[in-house]
Amino acid sequence: IGRLVKAGKITSIEEIYTFSLPIKEPEIVDKLLPELKEEVMQVFPVQKQTTAGQRTRFKAFVAVGDCNGHVGLGSKCAKEVAGAIRGAILVAKMSVVPVRRGYWGDNAGNVHTVPVKVTGKCGSVRVRLIPAPRGTGIVASPVLKKLLTLAGIDDVYTSSRGHTRTLGNSIKACFAALKHTYSYYTPNFWHNTCTEQIPYQRFTDFLSKEMKAKEY
């Protein structure tokens, strides 16, 4: 995928999502979504008991999104805060997913909320996203509000259950709910069948060429 994106054969990230291809390089997302924004959700110390004593590291949760239907979430542990944040950003970029948006009531104007009720879970936490009328805003906790804003959701009600004080699980549950917006078919999608070949087949000749190593 990286070679096809670099050569300009794949120009939209939707082509990758259509065939459910894995994104294994953050540079792919940098090229296809240059307007991504980054937001640090939480940084906290974690400890591990060893024979030499307690070993303290830092864990960071970072969300990325373009506020237009694409969002990713990543976490990383490192000895230093800066290293944990940098690693979490790379993981978040490789986990970017599309978010399906819709309307509450009539289909006037731009999409502004989730199309149906969706639920995500992680551990004991359950987060439910409920469509809201235009002008409501994001009714959620401050951390979840950041994630929903990066996803491009303008109006939504949220309901959470479980041990929501575990902030990492709350963030993951909300991200899972956003992923579930594309886990079902509605009648307006029934006629859209994909008849294209997978990019690996379309560009077989290009991929079969041997890459020459640069000489310095």
Q: Residues of each region from the PLM?
A:
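Ribosome-associated RNA-binding proteins
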Residues: G2-Y216
